[in-house]
UniProtKB/Swiss-Prot annotation:
The keyword Transcription regulation appears for this protein: yes
Feature: DNA-binding region: 178-205
GO MF, one annotated term: DNA binding
Keyword RNA-binding: no
Other noteworthy facts: Multiple copies of the gene are present in highly virulent fusarium oxysporum strains.
Function: Zn(2)-C6 fungal-type transcription factor that has a role in the establishment of the fungus within the plant and/or the progress of the disease. Regulates the expression of virulence factors such as SIX1 and SIX6.
GO cellular component: nucleus
Phylogenetic lineage: Eukaryota, Fungi, Dikarya, Ascomycota, Pezizomycotina
Keywords recorded for this protein, A-Z: Metal-binding, Nucleus, Transcription, Transcription regulation, Virulence
CDD domains: fungal_TF_MHR, GAL4
Name of the protein in question: Zn(2)-C6 fungal-type transcription factor FTF1a
Source organism of the structure: Fusarium oxysporum f. sp. lycopersici (strain 4287 / CBS 123668 / FGSC 9935 / NRRL 34936)
SMART domains: Fungal_trans, GAL4
Length: 1072
């Protein structure tokens, strides 16, 4: 056996000599083989081989320790050199190394064992040599070439094979390999606590258990996705948090490319594809607008984007704005004449500051300029047209902008709607004003202005913006302005109110100085409750009533007036189970509320000269006067309603007498307040103040015909004040033309009743109050183009307006046919309307003949008046309204006398007869225009009323204490309801109005009572100025004395050839 092992010792020595350079420096390896070398090859060490051993042909490869490419390396780099040198002198078998060095080398290093192909590895010391068998086994069994040992086929079944998979199937693969086998990439047997390999290698067997799944191999698409993900993370850090909420809802896709060469499984799976899951959402996201959602807005994104794209409110309408100087001037006019009287809108310091900075929306500036232009005297703003139409061009632009944004509520548009409604109210456009008011109310509720909110409701819940005191007060005042507009516009008989008092849960406005200087203070609600009471230690004024100013009590006064209107005109009186004179009736409750409201005013708001001066210094005197006028008007309105109950059974005399006293006291008080305002030059410009003056005037008309001399004198003086105020208001608010006409009608009815002396109490009917909102029915479409005094002609109904109604018959009766034919008068009016402006300046033809019939005379006067008045009228163009012009009447223009006999009796110096001397161009300047407007008719006995003695020459010729010729007192036999409702008394009038139809101008009562028609004696009185003393004569011997109607000149009296006032258009020539 030994001889076979060493049969060719030369060949063995040559193979060792051809080894690597690693062992060249070891002399023992190159010497003659020692006995230990022969012992190393002894067959006893290979007893496991089953066949004879003939020697290895390539034995040098077994003992080769390094590759030829690494022969240049230093031997010191290999610590195995000492091991091999010791191996030559030891008696250990081939392949056996000391265990001490092996364990020390394996345990002293944490690095993995070197690979056997590495140049630093030693095949003799590689622990993997045990993988092919134990040390007692021979190498000739083929395991060195990768073959399996015989025992592998008969090895027991591994323990892990008994485990099942999650699906319950038999496991074919090892679930987990140890760390050593994983590093060497060999198959692990999986035994625990140590696998076979680790037992052979005598190393520690460790199984690393982890829950993290292995990451997939990074592909090309994933490699491109990494920088995109990093860039996305950077962008997310820059995006605001509010927008991250939207971005977080979109899941970022993770793209996994398909492995090339693989075929997708045809088996149906439970998981859906990416297209099926994310396809619709991705399409919607791709087609959505690119702009993000507006912050602080919960409306649908489509509306937000649409509004954002055409967000022109900040600069839309800028081309129609006037100059900066006019804007600031009209803003001051607005806060001096409109603010606080109609509505408490806008915060003046904020508005003026934004106006100077140019940050106000043009639509708001246009609206303010439109409503304020009527009150300015600036020549850059005023035009040849009437005052109330000066701002119509600006209003039309503002209204177009507002109507295009009706579905987007905001405070700016809402404020513009309220102011535009007031402007259209003044131009007699009732349809527009009514519609704008309703639109504003709906928008206010949409903005939740009826709730006292601390945060802006338009913001999102996550970004609530707390409102400041000024902003909360502005919201409250806008809502109260909507409430007032609803009460004003719904005061008519057929116009119910929309806003209920219990729906407004906000406090009343604070004092004006608190609002201007940003001083928070608690106030009461409309029902008297305090929503947010404070203690005196909070730094605020604790008394809520003291914190309320003029605006708060004005709102309470108008709210009470609305309840009175509901009771008297909208069915509340019929629902009252008790008669009004009973203590349990609703009427008595309203009466007590009216009286208690005035008594509940704080000391700073009670009327006195001192408080009026204080408010004048604060520039709120007009508001202070307007509030007290409204309080007195409530007393007048509710007290006068009791006059209709005096005919009923069971009424107490005290009830009627107290109501009568309260009515006259309130009417006189209103006139005193108007006179006080005129003396202080505090113009009360609120339209409702004009209605209060109108109601007071109707009471003064009844006082003039009273048998009480003191009441009569007071009524005459107060009537003069009221009528003068109404004529002044007529320039700014068009509906006062209608009110003046109604006052004229009532006054003529009172004079007719006084002259007739007939008892009309038996013919009295239920009184019909003229409501503040009734002008809507009188002026549905503004004023007429030609006269500017008549309501606009009713347009023919559109044929499509009755499309949903029943089909009517197309046949006409004879009466209906003739009613459609135009009358000669209407034809003349049409010719007058169609006449051009140059033709209107031609002089009217004189007519000296007496008409045969009174009716014919009236028609001729009306046609002549239209030509005469047209000479002085100029029409405004380009304003965009139906009423393109108005009468600018010159009160110094005189007419030709229609009665030559009467004209010769007038003094040649009388200004009323100046046209008789047309060649004289001089007109006395000491006659005020108001006096030239007076026209005196005749009474029953030729006496002059005491009030007019200071006005007329010859007015002191007779004693006025005789009163009427028969000494009859006119209060008896005269029903208040008859006069107020316009009922005509019969008897004593001799049918003078039987041939005259009632018209809008009021000439039906004008000419029938004049001296030129009735044949009575003409008056010798002529005007004297207020600032001149009456002549010191007792009687004029040259002229006949005639009775004078004291207010015929004011309301269109008899036809004496003087200038008489027209009911709506001002004064009008009464001559041929």
């Amino acid at each position: 056996m030994s001889g076979r092992a060493v049969s060719n010792p030369q060949h063995a020595q040559q193979s060792f000599d051809s080894g690597p350079q690693l062992y060249r420096d070891v002399p023992e390896l190159h010497a003659v083989p020692s006995p230990s070398h022969s012992a190393l090859m002894d067959s006893t060490h290979f007893d496991d081989f089953a066949f004879a051993y003939h020697g290895l042909p390539d034995q040098s490869s077994l003992v080769s320790l390094a590759d030829h490419t690494h022969t240049s390396q230093s031997p010191t780099a290999f610590p195995q050199h000492q091991a091999m040198s010791g191996l030559a002198h030891s008696g250990l078998p081939f392949g056996t190394l000391p265990t001490g060095n092996r364990s020390q080398s394996m345990e002293g290093s944490e690095l993995p064992p070197p690979d056997r192909t590495s140049p630093a590895s030693n095949a003799l010391e590689d622990p993997t040599t045990d993988e092919f068998g134990l040390a007692s086994r021979n190498r000739a069994d083929g395991t060195d070439l990768g073959g399996k040992h015989k025992e592998d086929k008969v090895d027991a079944t591994p323990a892990w094979s008994e485990l099942k998979t999650k699906a319950g199937k038999e496991r074919k693969r090892l679930p987990l390999a140890c760390m050593a086998c994983r590093r060497k990439k060999i198959r692990c047997s999986g035994e625990k606590p140590a696998c076979k390999h680790c037992l052979r290698s005598r190393i520690l067997c460790v199984y690393k258990v982890t829950t993290r799944k292995a990451a997939p191999r990074t592909g090309y698409i994933a490699m491109l996705d990494k920088p995109l993900k990093r860039m996305e993370e950077r962008i997310i850090k820059v995006i605001p948090k509010s927008d991250q909420e939207v971005a977080s809802s979109v899941t970022r896709a993770v793209v996994k490319p398909v492995i090339p060469g693989t075929v997708p499984s045809s088996k149906p799976t439970k998981k859906r594809g990416a297209e099926e899951v994310f396809g619709p959402d991705l399409d919607a996201w791709a087609k959505a607008p690119s702009k993000p959602k507006i912050e602080g807005d919960d409306r649908p994104s489509c509306l937000q984007v649409q509004e954002a794209e055409e967000n022109m409110l900040q600069h839309e309408g800028a081309e129609a704005l006037p100059s900066k100087e006019i804007q600031e001037h009209l803003a001051e006019v607005f806060f001096d004449n409109i603010y606080g009287q109609s509505y408490h809108l806008l915060h003046k310091p904020s508005y003026m500051r934004k106006l100077k900075n140019g940050t106000l929306p043009p639509v708001l500036v246009l609206t303010v300029c439109a409503v304020a232009a009527r009150f300015t005297s600036n020549p850059l703003v005023s035009s040849s047209g009437p005052e109330l139409l000066r701002g119509e061009e600006w209003a039309s632009h503002a209204q177009d902008i507002c109507t295009r944004r009706y579905e987007w509520p905001n405070l700016t548009i809402l404020t513009c709607l309220l102011i535009l409604g007031l402007h259209e109210f003044g131009t007699c456009q009732s349809g527009r004003s009514w519609a704008l008011g309703g639109h504003a109310i709906r928008m206010a509720f949409a903005l939740q202005l009826h709730k006292d909110l601390e945060y802006d409701p338009s913001g999102r819940h996550s970004t609530k913006t707390q409102l400041s005191f000024i902003d909360r007060e502005i919201r409250r005042r806008i809502m109260w302005a909507c409430f007032l507009m609803d009460r004003f516009n719904s005061s008519g008989t057929d116009r119910p109110m929309f806003i209920r008092e219990d729906t407004i849960q906000i406090p009343l406005p604070v004092k004006e100085k608190y609002f201007q200087f940003d001083l928070p203070a608690p106030t009461e609600m409309l029902d008297g409750q305090v929503p947010h009471p404070v203690s005196p230690n909070d730094g605020q004024i604790a008394d809520a009533r003291e914190n309320m100013g003029v605006a708060a009590f004005l709102i309470r006064a108008i709210a009470l007036w609305g309840r009175i209107i509901t009771y008297l005109s909208q069915g509340g009186k019929d629902l009252d189970p008790n008669p009004m004179w009973e203590d349990e009736s609703h009427y008595v409750k309203h009466l007590n509320d009216v009286v208690n409201l005035e008594a509940s005013l704080p000391l700073s708001l009670k009327y006195s000269a001192e408080n009026l001066e204080v408010h004048k210094t604060e520039n709120t005197a007009s508001q202070f006067l307007f509030m007290h006028i409204c309080l007195q008007h409530n007393i007048l309105f509710v007290s006068r309603a009791a006059m209709s109950a005096r005919k009923q059974r069971g009424v107490h005399d005290d009830f009627f007498s107290e109501a009568s006293k309260r009515t006259f006291d309130a009417a006189n008080r209103i006139s005193e307040l108007l006179r006080e305002a005129e003396q202080l030059r505090c113009f009360v410009s609120a339209p409702f103040a004009g209605y209060c003056a109108f109601s007071s005037t109707t009471v003064h008309i009844l006082g003039i015909i009273s048998r009480n001399p003191s009441m009569k004198l007071a009524a005459q003086a107060n009537l003069t004040t009221n009528v003068k105020y109404l004529h002044k208001m007529k320039k700014y608010w068009g509906m006062f033309h209608w009110m003046v006409e109604n006052v004229h009608t009532q006054y003529r009815n009172a004079l007719d009743a006084m002259r007739a002396g007939a008892n009309v109490q038996e013919r009295a009917t239920q009184s019909s109050f003229l409501q503040y909102g009734d002008w809507f029915n009188c002026y549905p479409h503004g004023l007429s183009d030609a006269e500017f005094m008549d309501p606009a002609t009713l347009k023919r109904k559109d044929s499509g307006a009755d499309g949903v109604l029943e089909a009517k018959s197309e046949l006409q009766s004879v009466e209906e046919y003739f009613s459609t034919l135009p009358t000669p008068r209407s034809a003349e009016n049409k010719d007058t309307i169609r006449a051009a402006a140059p033709k209107r300046k031609q002089s009217a033809k004189k007519q000296t003949g007496m008409p045969a019939q009174p009716g014919q005379h009236l028609d001729s006067l009306q046609s002549t008046d239209a030509d005469a008045v047209s000479q002085e009228r100029k029409f405004s163009g380009g304003l965009g309204l139906q009423t393109t012009g108005a009468a600018d009447f010159n009160p110094l223009a005189a007419s030709n006398p229609q009665n030559p006999a009467f004209s010769t009796t007038m003094p040649p110096t009388s200004p009323a007869n100046m046209t008789a001397f047309a060649h004289h161009a001089y007109t006395p300047t000491f006659f005020p225009p108001e006096l030239l407007a007076m026209n005196f008719g005749q009474g029953s006995n030729g006496n002059i009323d005491p009030l007019d003695r200071q006005l007329v020459y010859g007015g002191y010729s007779m004693d006025a204490s005789t009163g009427l010729g028969d000494g009859q007192d006119m209060t008896s036999g005269l029903d208040w309801d008859t006069v107020a409702s316009g009922a005509q008394p019969d008897g004593g009038l001799q049918g003078r109005r039987s041939n005259v139809k009632a018209g809008m101008h009021g000439q039906s009562a004008g000419m029938a009572d004049g001296a030129g028609l009735s044949g009575l004696e003409a008056s010798s009185a002529w005007f004297m100025p207020f600032n001149m003393e009456p002549p010191d004569i007792g009687q004029d011997p040259g002229f006949n004395m005639g009775g004078i109607d004291p207010f015929a000149g004011v309301f269109g009296g008899g036809g004496s050839g003087l200038a008489t006032p027209n009911a709506l258009g001002g004064l009008q020539q009464q001559g041929p």
